[in-house]
């Protein structure tokens, strides 16, 4: 079978090679991406420190420790008795069987594993974007700049704040997956499809099913496009081979990930997320991306985020109306090149494809804020089992980074052609428009700053300052592009300047989402409550009762966290996304959350706060026998409790 040639680079043969092809080869680029990832996360590897992450500290760390302990003992864990009354391990094994996770567990203490995962995954993000850009015909330095832009793009880097390793494992593999699919369809070789299978298997082994669903959906759209783009629809033999290899790679990826999915298949019907028809449209559209999130692609302060500095407790963004621990920021380079690309790269069929994919992903991310989601909800199989449609935004951010690479490559082609003809760049190429388009982006940002005002409350960062920061970096990118296209700056200087501006720009925002905290030995040391519970007879369960406005014992999340797991203490609830549905119904299923404990708390009219000699206390009246039947012997609360069947047995940190 004849092989299809890669997309041609249209630079003139008369262009100076030293200026069009800089020595940014694969090995150098790979080394730079790795060093940048290691430098970024290095503080988490210091002695006595570990990654800070809201979900990580509430739940993930303890499951990391649980698996490491069981694997170290040579056993395969099947049941977790410590959270939500107990559940099978395969209810959500997380990234336990992911190769990067397993390697980290083999090399490092548990408290360092998540940092290791992030270093490897963000290295692969930059490397994958470099390879994809090269596969699409971009010169090496353009691919390198694009790699920086995606490696540090806001949405994936901001997931670090919660410690969402699964989301990051999937989204950072998107460029590699697209690279292998393109190379496979273009060449007809087996090896690229094997690469696609391995890449997809790594994503699936994260057990982040929702993000993997979005990656598969985007990959399917990409593959169909490529079959037509490379003319395989006119060659039945080549078409059949490519389709067979494509489906075979997906099947092989699921086979590699079957350690997770085969046991999980039988659990779906027992899960709160496995209800026939899902949990309804309102549940599925919860945590939709707000329309203001579109502006956050340029100015993350505009939509805000509900994150704080864990050390100072000061807000790091203006308050968000909902619950938001991430940002949509893609950086000034990507936004300026998006505007420039409309004028210069529109004829590129790949640019138009990724523009369409970005629009599709954005319309999905907006969820319930657009009527289009009802169409997706009805037409796309399995979508009704998910919530938080804003998770698909990583596909949009990825698409925008690819579009930036294609636009920059087009500018490089026009610049080389104008130099070869020995005429001014402005004469026929129209490159002078780059300056005016960039200045238009800067002017829009300055206008936004004038209209934005300050933070929503005292002590919050200013929205106006966010607009001005974007204006400054957009101005820097515009100046660099103008100097380069006007032949006042060489390609080496342009590559260094654009890469440096992009790295600095994204680093400033990303760093708000990266923090470290005390290492496990100090952070998770046994407190007085644990010391008391360890002296009590077992088996029994503990209910860490969340009281609004007060912290939860054990550094837990809204349901108490999984801190007691370290000491073999079983809980009524904990931190877990997919407990047994029958247990959830027993303690009280929620509408927006998995559980609201209404059965254990009792009727709404029996709940309240009363004044006692010790201050305010919580009154509740659970249904008779429910606590006893659940073997709940102790309730841990940060506020006094008023109930005739309870007596205080310990008072200390809770």
PLM segments and residue spans:
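Hydrophobic alpha-helical membrane-insertion signals
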Residues: 12-90, 265-274, 292, 339, ...
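Contiguous transmembrane helix-bundle modules in multi-pass membrane proteins
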Residues: 2-4, 9-10, 163-173, 180, ...
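Membrane-interface coil-to-helix junctions
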Residues: 36-129, 148-171, 175, 281-332, ...
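Transmembrane-helix signature of polytopic, membrane-embedded enzymes
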Residues: 129-152, 187-193
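Soluble catalytic regions of membrane-associated enzymes that act on cell-envelope
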Residues: 301-302, 309-322, 326, 460-465, ...
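Polar, glycine-rich mid-to-C-terminal structural blocks
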Residues: 211, 241-291
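Transmembrane helix irregularities
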Residues: 107, 152, 202-210, 254-256, ...
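Transmembrane-helix signature of membrane-embedded glycosylation machinery that interfaces
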Residues: 129-137, 178-181, 185, 342, ...
């Amino acid at each position: 079978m004849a092989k299809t040639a890669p997309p041609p680079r249209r630079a003139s043969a008369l262009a100076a090679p030293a200026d069009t092809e800089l020595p940014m080869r694969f090995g150098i680029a790979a080394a730079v991406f790795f060093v940048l990832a290691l430098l970024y996360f290095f503080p988490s590897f210091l002695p006595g420190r570990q990654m800070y992450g809201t979900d990580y500290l509430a739940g993930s760390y303890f499951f990391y420790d649980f698996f490491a302990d069981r694997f170290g003992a040579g056993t395969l864990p099947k049941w977790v008795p410590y959270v939500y009354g107990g559940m099978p391990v395969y209810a959500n094994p997380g990234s336990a069987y992911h190769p990067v996770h397993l390697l980290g567990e083999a090399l490092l203490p548990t408290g360092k594993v998540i940092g290791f995962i992030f270093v490897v995954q963000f290295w692969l993000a930059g490397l994958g974007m470099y390879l994809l850009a090269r596969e699409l015909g971009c010169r090496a330095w353009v691919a390198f700049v694009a790699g920086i832009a995606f490696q540090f793009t806001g949405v994936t880097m901001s997931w670090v704040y919660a410690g969402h390793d699964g989301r990051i494992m999937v989204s950072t593999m998107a460029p590699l997956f697209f690279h292998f699919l393109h190379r496979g369809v273009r060449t007809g070789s087996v090896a690229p499809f094997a690469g696609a299978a391995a890449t997809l298997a790594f994503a699936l082994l994260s057990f982040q099913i929702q993000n993997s669903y979005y990656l598969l959906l985007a990959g399917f759209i990409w593959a169909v496009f490529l079959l037509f783009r490379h003319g395989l629809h006119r060659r039945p033999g080549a078409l059949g081979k490519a389709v067979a290899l494509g489906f075979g790679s997906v099947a092989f990826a699921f086979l590699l990930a079957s350690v997770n999915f085969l046991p999980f298949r039988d659990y779906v019907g027992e899960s709160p997320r496995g209800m026939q028809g899902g949990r309804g449209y309102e549940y599925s559209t919860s945590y939709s991306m707000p329309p203001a999130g579109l502006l956050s692609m340029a100015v993350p302060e505009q939509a805000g985020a509900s994150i704080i500095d864990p050390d100072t407790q000061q807000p790091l963004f203006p308050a968000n109306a909902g619950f938001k621990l991430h940002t949509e920021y893609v950086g000034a380079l990507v936004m300026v090149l998006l505007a420039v690309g409309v004028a210069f790269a529109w004829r590129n069929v790949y640019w138009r494809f990724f523009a369409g994919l970005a629009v599709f992903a954005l319309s999905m991310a907006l969820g319930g804020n657009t009527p289009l989601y009802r169409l997706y909800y009805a037409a796309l199989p399995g979508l009704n089992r998910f919530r938080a449609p804003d998770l698909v935004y990583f596909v949009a951010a990825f698409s925008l980074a690819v579009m930036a690479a294609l636009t920059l490559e087009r500018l490089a082609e026009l610049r080389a052609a104008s130099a070869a003809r020995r005429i001014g760049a402005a004469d026929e190429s129209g490159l002078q428009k780059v300056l005016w388009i960039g200045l238009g982006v800067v002017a829009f940002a300055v206008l936004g700053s004038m209209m934005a005002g300050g933070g929503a409350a005292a002590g919050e960062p200013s929205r106006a300052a966010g607009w001005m920061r974007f204006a400054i970096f957009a101005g820097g990118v515009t100046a660099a592009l103008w100097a380069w296209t006007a032949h006042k700056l060489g390609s080496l200087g342009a590559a260094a300047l654009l890469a440096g501006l992009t790295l600095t720009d994204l680093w400033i925002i990303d760093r708000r989402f990266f923090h470290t905290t005390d290492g496990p030995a100090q952070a998770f040391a046994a407190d007085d409550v644990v010391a008391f519970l360890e002296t009590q007879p077992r088996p029994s369960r503990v209910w860490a009762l969340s009281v609004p406005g007060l912290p939860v014992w054990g550094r837990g999340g809204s349901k108490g966290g999984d801190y007691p797991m370290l000491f073999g203490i079983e809980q009524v609830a904990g931190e877990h996304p997919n407990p047994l549905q029958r247990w959830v119904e027993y303690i009280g299923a929620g509408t927006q959350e998995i559980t609201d404990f209404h059965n254990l708390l009792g009727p709404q009219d029996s709940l309240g706060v009363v004044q006692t000699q010790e201050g305010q206390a919580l009154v509740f009246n659970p249904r008779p026998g429910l606590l006893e039947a659940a073997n709940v012997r102790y309730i841990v609360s940060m506020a006094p409790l008023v109930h005739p069947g309870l007596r205080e047995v310990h008072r200390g940190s809770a």
